[in-house]
């Protein structure tokens, strides 16, 4: 019996080593009950981090929360055809790998990303989606780039410290962006647009190269700089109440 227990111990130890080095040498603290469809990284004292999403997905859902000792957590449904993989460190790269061979696995799924509110984030959405939803209120963001196409891009941003650049290089049908009230946003429509609503202006047939600069933007110490180099159909800017708790 003792020999059998020893062999089991060796197998368990070997499995732990495989988990630790399976992706780019990055160790994952997964409990015995953890699903293969969940990946996380430890906070490890970091105050800032960059994330690049490199695999396309039907729906990408990103939010901010107090994760205590975790830097980020990513999940796909247990029945999804893919599972999340995290690699690298600067930036951290989120990709998707095959989730198994079960014929009933779904190809209509959401990749859910929860980011720690304890760090300042730089985000690059570099893979196409049908819909990207990112509610980043309650967090801190230094910059965002969307470099791949999306049917619907729906993003809520926190109050920035200084200038927060937002680069839109991937084509988008509907671009919905919610900003804190009282923070000016300059919008550069580099590729043209069918419709733009900034809250103070409603424009149709907007020519490429149009720059919409609100009063006070040039001297503001907290502001957004939205540069849409690619074309889009509709841009709607709304405002949320910064006095609300998120």
Regions found by a protein language model. Name each.
Residues 73-86, 90-107, 145, 152-246:
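Short, surface-exposed interaction patches in beta-rich subdomains
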Residues 41-70:
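Short extracytoplasmic
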Residues 58, 84-88, 119:
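Membrane-proximal soluble helical/coiled-coil segments
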């Amino acid at each position: 019996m003792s020999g059998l227990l020893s062999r089991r111990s060796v197998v368990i130890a070997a499995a732990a080593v495989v988990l630790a080095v399976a992706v780019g040498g990055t160790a994952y603290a997964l409990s015995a009950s953890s699903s293969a469809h969940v990946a996380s990284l430890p906070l490890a004292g970091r105050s800032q981090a960059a994330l690049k999403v490199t695999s396309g997905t039907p729906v990408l859902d990103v939010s901010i929360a107090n994760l205590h000792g975790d830097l980020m957590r990513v999940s796909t449904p247990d029945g999804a055809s893919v599972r999340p993989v995290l690699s690298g460190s600067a930036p951290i790269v989120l990709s998707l790998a095959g989730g198994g061979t079960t014929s009933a696995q779904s190809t209509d799924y959401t990749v859910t990303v929860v980011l720690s509110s304890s760090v300042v984030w730089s985000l690059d959405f570099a893979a196409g989606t049908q819909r990207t939803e990112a509610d980043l209120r309650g967090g801190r963001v230094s910059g965002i780039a969307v470099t791949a196409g999306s049917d619907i891009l729906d993003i809520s941003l926190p109050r920035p410290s200084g200038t927060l650049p937002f680069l839109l290089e991937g084509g988008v049908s509907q671009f919905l962006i919610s900003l804190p009230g009282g923070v000016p946003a300059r919008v550069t429509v580099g590729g043209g647009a069918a419709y733009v609503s900034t809250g103070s202006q409603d424009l149709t047939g907007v020519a490429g190269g149009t720059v919409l600069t609100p009063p006070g933007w040039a001297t503001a110490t907290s502001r957004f700089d939205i540069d849409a180099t690619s074309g889009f159909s509709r841009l709607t800017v709304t405002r949320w109440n910064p006095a609300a708790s998120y």
